[in-house]
A protein has these predicted regions:
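Helix-loop boundary and gating motifs at the non-cytosolic
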Residues: 2-61, 211
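Paired small-residue
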Residues: 19-20, 104-113
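Residue-level signature of mid-helix packing/kink "hotspots" within the transmembrane helices
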Residues: 57-65, 153-154, 158
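Helix-to-loop junctions at the C-terminal end of transmembrane segments
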Residues: 62-76, 164
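C-terminal ends and interior cores of transmembrane alpha-helices
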Residues: 85-101
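Cytoplasmic helix-loop-helix junction between adjacent transmembrane helices
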Residues: 109-151
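C-terminal membrane-cytosol helix-exit motif in multi-pass small-molecule transporters
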Residues: 120-121, 174, 179-202
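Transmembrane alpha-helix termini and helix-breaking/packing motifs in multi-pass membrane transporters
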Residues: 155-178
Length: 211
């Protein structure tokens, strides 16, 4: 199995987009726990912390399908302004926590950050499907990405907790690392044009439906 992974990672551009895709996915396992711990520490309210985490996830769930359809039509670089908006909103959340802004500010920033983040894992898998030729290779690639997801969900929360609960560091340090990983990983990933799947464009049915 290991040799199969090595073989697909040797494909032109494969290792680079897989690695940057992993970095870009780290925030998905760090943001919720980082927000919860930071907000509870500064606002002394698990209720507000839970609300902010819930708003982030709900906003993501509501917009991810729409963003995915637009990526199919216009290509993966369509996500760049949305990723930038998500990062800026996360910075806004960090500033709001630091200066004890009104809870509404936290909720607004959380909604924007979650609603514009999109699914980086889906973009990585789309590149594998475009790059590889055989079903066996694609199956191996998807198995690799599933393992990458597990790495993110194991390492991310541990890293976030260590950062937030380390007294010399600010309580927002978990969010700072998460937004840095999102910005660097996502933009580096999306800048790799050679492995980007071609945009499908609008079909006649989509034009008529106004999608």
């Amino acid at each position: 199995m290991a040799s199969n992974y090595v073989n697909i990672l040797r494909k032109p551009g494969a290792f680079k987009f897989s690695a940057t895709g992993l970095l870009a996915r780290m925030p998905m396992s760090m943001v919720s726990i980082s927000s919860l711990l930071a907000i509870q520490s500064e606002y002394h309210s698990y209720t507000l912390a839970g609300q902010v985490s819930a708003v982030t996830l709900i906003a993501f769930a509501c917009t991810a399908p729409w963003l995915a359809r637009r990526v199919d039509i216009y290509g993966q670089r369509f996500m760049i302004p949305f990723i930038m908006a998500s990062c800026l909103a996360m910075v806004g959340e960090i500033v709001s926590i630091t200066f004890h802004a009104h809870p509404v500010a936290l909720l607004v920033c959380a909604a924007i950050a979650g609603g514009t983040s999109g699914s980086m894992g889906a973009l990585v898998r789309a590149r594998w499907s475009n790059l590889l030729q055989t079903p066996d290779e694609i199956h191996t690639a998807f198995a690799l990405e599933a393992a990458m997801d597990e790495v993110a969900f194991i390492v991310g929360p541990i890293l976030a907790t260590m950062l937030v609960t380390n007294p010399p560091l600010p309580v927002t340090s978990g969010l700072i690392v998460a937004v840095t990983a999102q910005a660097v990983g996502s933009l580096w990933f999306l800048s790799q044009r050679a492995t980007e799947p071609p945009a499908k464009g609008r079909t006649a049915a989509q034009e008529q439906a106004g999608q």
